[in-house]
Design a protein with these regions (language model features):
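Repeat-blade elements of multi-bladed beta-propeller folds
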Residues: 11, 15, 19-42, 59-81, ...
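Hydrophobic beta-strand positions in blades of beta-propellers and related beta-sheet-rich domains
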Residues: 1, 41-44, 80-84, 131
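Aromatic (tryptophan-biased) beta-strands that constitute blades/sheets of beta-rich domains
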Residues: 1-21, 48-63, 87-97, 102, ...
Length: 146
């Protein structure tokens, strides 16, 4: 409670990653969007702590990077740069020629999605190691998250 400082709720969850992972997958951080607290792979009502069953985010592929967010999407590494469309609850791969860095490396800002170069020197085999900026272009193609 912001006026009293009292704890309003607590919650525990299985984040579906083994303890002591070897590639950062155990270090994912929460994201707040409007009245939702998203703690991968689940989401909660920020005011009550009630689990929102419609959210059950499952990254496909390698997912060591931390999430970032806009008002309508989550962004993260799922092998490649990936967008999770909150309204549709669908994944959309942004590109397949690169991978974002292992920290918060996909920045939605001003209608663009920016991915600063953060993979050079990595042993992953992706062709493009450069900073990129993406503009919206029509209806995105999506894939199921289940």
């Amino acid at each position: 409670d912001s006026s009293s400082g009292n704890l309003l709720w607590t919650q525990t969850q299985d984040n579906r990653n083994r303890p002591g992972g070897d590639h950062g997958e155990q270090d994912h951080h929460p994201v707040v969007i409007d009245d939702k607290l998203i703690i991968e792979p689940l989401a909660y009502d920020l005011a009550t702590g009630k689990r929102l069953p419609e959210y059950d985010l499952r990254r496909h592929g390698h997912g060591c990077g931390t999430m970032s967010a806009s008002a309508s999407s989550l962004y993260f590494r799922a092998t490649n740069p990936t967008e999770y469309l909150l309204g549709e609850r669908k994944l959309r791969r942004i590109t397949t020629v690169s991978r974002p860095g292992c920290w918060i490396n996909i920045i939605p800002a001003g209608g663009l999605v920016l991915i600063p170069e953060a993979s050079s020197g990595c042993t992953c085999d992706f062709a493009v190691q450069a900073s990129m900026a993406f503009l919206p272009s029509g209806k995105p193609q999506t894939e199921s998250t289940k």
